[in-house]
């Protein structure tokens, strides 16, 4: 209430601030504004208006018409210029001379150019319209001569300007040619200032309300929309403004992509609320609550009772039910039983289930490869000679696209690497090489099945074995082709043309992509590319490439990924259902996709967006022998990290091999060179004390400074091989401040709290952007390591590089050069390097506006997930909502050394706390579709006869509901199945009895992670056939059915046509006969 009293409304012309030479602060966005929403390929290809960036903050001066006070205001103003009149809500913080804008301004065009200042405003407006200064002066003199400025206003400005051109052309044709005049007119007409003024004349409601309702879409709407779109919005604002609150309606009726006004934005427009009925207002409130809950908790649905009870302060239960029915009628939500879904989330989970089921129902593509050969090659052994017998059954794959890079395939052992040309170390036999049986099973499953999910911690070899399998396939094909060429060359009748033709494809011709490696983030894709020495893309890049191909209308040129037969998705826990649905559908419809391989760790944090794709698919497919866990760690230097990750997954306190106490005089361990898991203990604090927050910041700063300056801590000599991770953003800010002073010697912010960037800084992008959007305008300084000075004949290659190279959200760069160019305009140029082969010089202002860079010595756990580093430092901070999965995910980011900075009590609290289970239905949808489609459960003929796979494959029924162990309470295995859903072990220091009692009533017990870490029997519980199931199904054959009689036949009945009945000895039958 006090805050409302301090709010003030200003109304007046928008004047520039007298000392406004500052740069727009585009990097300092609020936390909720940083999320860049994924756009589906169908929406991209629709030609609709997409969201842009928020306008940067700037200071302006507003002479208030109410009080006549000249107010300095700081906020986001998408349009600037004294010809605009604005209405804005402001708040003045204590000890501040500037008002802070709350929300966004409403714009009104001063049609009469604000007499008596028409001449000045007209001059400034034409200058903003890119008209030359001398031309402006000529026009102003002409206006004074033929008329007066009192008669000049925006409604007749364009006609007056065109009349000026015609008269000057008649008077003196030597001054300018008609073509030059047309060019000037075109520049004015195409300028953003002119377009926005004309839109304001024609659609005043659009200018008044859209800056608040659609802040990201506003500038793009008025600059690129047709009069039809703007007219639709103008009409809706005057009659049915509630429609603008639902993205499905704005897309369906106005072709606006992911565009909707929030309930908070509507609340700032009381005149629009007056046009809504109570039913429409309640629908907007419910929709806002549903979307907020799904975004914050990761759910794809909410139970009706939970949703309505959370809205009891806003509406009655009857009103909530009426509003939900209204939302269903307009196709915004979907009901299923007592569940309410957002339509797009329901469709995403349904479409994923349908696509996976379709893949598993297609004729299988079996890879006849000796997987032991493949695994032996990773360990440096000599495999059997891969002859032509090891080919692909059916149609042979074409060339598998590969781009050789500087990196080498990351082998499982630290010092063992695989040569990219397919050669292997000799003097070893396969039988002498100890193979990981989990990896054997995993590769045989991939070869035999259409869909495979592999889960395991970092270092278990998921990425290595998959990439090695397809490199092996590529090598087999190359060997076969080379042998065929040699045989043909030895043929005496071979033509000279064949012998003289080059064996290599021309430069610049891309190979067909058959194995598509993908990851959810740019950093994860970069790591995948570095480990496998194969091309890797983000899922968004695959999605966007289809859009680019569609918009170019190149019918004769196929889509880049139209030849894909295998899709590999790494870091599956980070993949949201929305983007996975889009990419999977694209490849199923527009490529030759035959195999899907998902890699990840089901124990890690799920995606930030709603859904729990990896875990849901894993749990569904494990009973069909298509989901495998790799348990063995192959990184010898990180065994303690893996062991502690196991303990944390059981919610047990980790074991440290070194400890550093932070107090007045920090005590250093004797030697830390050979330690891998180190506890940096902070002093315990009294949370009830008022000075607790200050003590925590002081202790954390001391701990970070001790690590950075300690002589024994060689891991921090370079920030390129170490990374700080924290749960809270405020802890990241403090660590970045300390690291910035240590590594580069400057502060991260100036006195106005603006970020400072300099040479040596470690930065990261928080939004995706293409390199072509970041280059300097003249492109003279944009000489990157990736392309350099391109000659004229290579201009297209250079252009393709710039348009295809993407700076991804989460990607880390180092600033290597900082230059300010003053030749034309004051332009700041930064040279940034990602330490993976890309170094480019970009325009600093464009980098800030498009990528919104931040310092990156410290990152939050959610933004660093999917990446890894040699040394990782995790700051627990105050536990709060933090639980064991946060700690688990953080420590598994470290390859060779992990530090944990925490109070022991906070660390214990975080590791003991259970996660928050996500409410999703993908598992249910997938089970239902697989059982209904009778898709083959697995390629048993190609599976190994390992007891771990177990069972009698020929007699096991496909996808029987009796095999769903968590729901089958009739078997003894089911009782043990409940145990596997509880991550705590018997030795855990947690009150498991109390928690178990709380969770017995829920299907998704505990964290929902599907198996105990080191219990193979629990992991593959359903693989061994149940005695009750096998005893029934083993003897069932369609050709051995015996006709049974339901009733005793009479004399005139044909006994040969009796129906199927129960056994004659069944008591029910005896009763019926009586």
Curated annotation (Swiss-Prot):
Biased-composition ranges for Acidic residues?
20-38
GO-annotated cellular components: cytoplasm; cytosol; DNA replication factor A complex; mitochondrion; nuclear body; nucleus; site of double-strand break
Q: Phosphothreonine (modified residue): where? A: 992
Give start-end ranges for motif Nuclear export signal: 1022-1046
Q: Which residues carry this modification: Phosphoserine?
A: 942, 946, 1015, 1026
Q: Which reaction does it catalyse?
A: ATP + H2O = ADP + phosphate + H(+)
Q: Which UniProt keywords apply?
A: ATP-binding, Chromosome, Cytoplasm, Helicase, Hydrolase, Nucleotide-binding, Nucleus, Phosphoprotein
Q: Where are the transmembrane segments?
A: none
Describe the PTM. Answer: Phosphorylated at Ser-942 by CDK2 during the G1/S transition, resulting in its nuclear export into the cytoplasm. As S phase progresses, its exclusion from the nucleus promotes the activation of long-range resection.
EC number of the protein: 3.6.4.12
The GO annotation for biological process reads: DNA damage response; DNA replication, synthesis of primer; DNA-templated DNA replication; negative regulation of double-strand break repair via homologous recombination; regulation of DNA double-strand break processing
Query: Care to name a GO molecular-function term for this sequence?
Result: 5'-3' DNA helicase activity
Where composition is biased (Polar residues), the residues are 934-946
Q: Where is this region: Disordered?
A: 1-38, 380-420, 932-1014, 1040-1074
**Stored InterPro entries:** Coronavir_polyprotein_1ab, P-loop_NTPase, UvrD-like_helicase_C
Could you say which enzyme class this protein belongs to?
Answer: hydrolase
As for subcellular location, the record says: Nucleus; Cytoplasm; Chromosome
PANTHER family of this UniProt entry? DNA HELICASE B (PTHR43788:SF6), DNA2/NAM7 HELICASE FAMILY MEMBER (PTHR43788)
Q: How does it assemble?
A: Binds to RPA1; this interaction promotes HELB recruitment to chromatin following DNA damage. Interacts with at least two subunits of the DNA polymerase alpha complex. Interacts with CDC45. Interacts with TOPB1.
- Please state what the protein is called: DNA helicase B
| Species name | Mus musculus
Gene from which the chain derives: Helb
